[in-house]
Amino acid sequence: MNLTHINEEGRARMVDVSEKAETKREAVAIGSIYMKNETLRRIHEGTIKKGDVLAVAQVAGIMAAKNTSHMIPMCHPIMITGCDISFNLDFENSKIDIKAVVKTVGQTGVEMEALTAVTVAALTIYDMCKAIDRDMVISEIMLVKKSGGKSGLYEREV
């Protein structure tokens, strides 16, 4: 297998995408944060002392998508044309499901931006609720869809 992020000397490099065609690209990532029922109820009711947990997590996820290249060394800075973070409060399983949809028109995909958005949104929920629930678990972060570019459509069965 040929690793594109390794140069001839075996050192890390950023892949040159200058010859790639610009195409419309989209990536969708999901993840979950499990918590106590009481924590989920308080998020839903808006009674967490630090504020509106989901509003802050939504903004944090968007900011994270926009700043992915600052956190992951080999990611290209990308002009994101759209980013949407959504939440589903699952009271039966005592968790919040997080979904990020990131779009661009460019020479490289936005998979890492979508994954980073979900991760940081989950971390923000953890941060805002840790005073009442240190048993929260962030898990199941994965790419579920990618479209555009040479490799075309990828969809994970979930």
UniProtKB/Swiss-Prot annotation:
It catalyses: (8S)-3',8-cyclo-7,8-dihydroguanosine 5'-triphosphate = cyclic pyranopterin phosphate + diphosphate. CDD domains: MoaC_PE (cd01420). It comes from the Bacteria. The keyword Metal-binding does not apply. Its EC number is 4.6.1.17. InterPro entries: MoaC, MoaC_bact/euk, MoaC_sf, MoCo_biosynth_MoaA/MoaC, Mopterin_CF_biosynth-C_dom. Catalyzes the conversion of (8S)-3',8-cyclo-7,8-dihydroguanosine 5'-triphosphate to cyclic pyranopterin monophosphate (cPMP). Homohexamer; trimer of dimers. This is Cyclic pyranopterin monophosphate synthase. It comes from Thermoanaerobacter pseudethanolicus (strain ATCC 33223 / 39E) (Clostridium thermohydrosulfuricum).
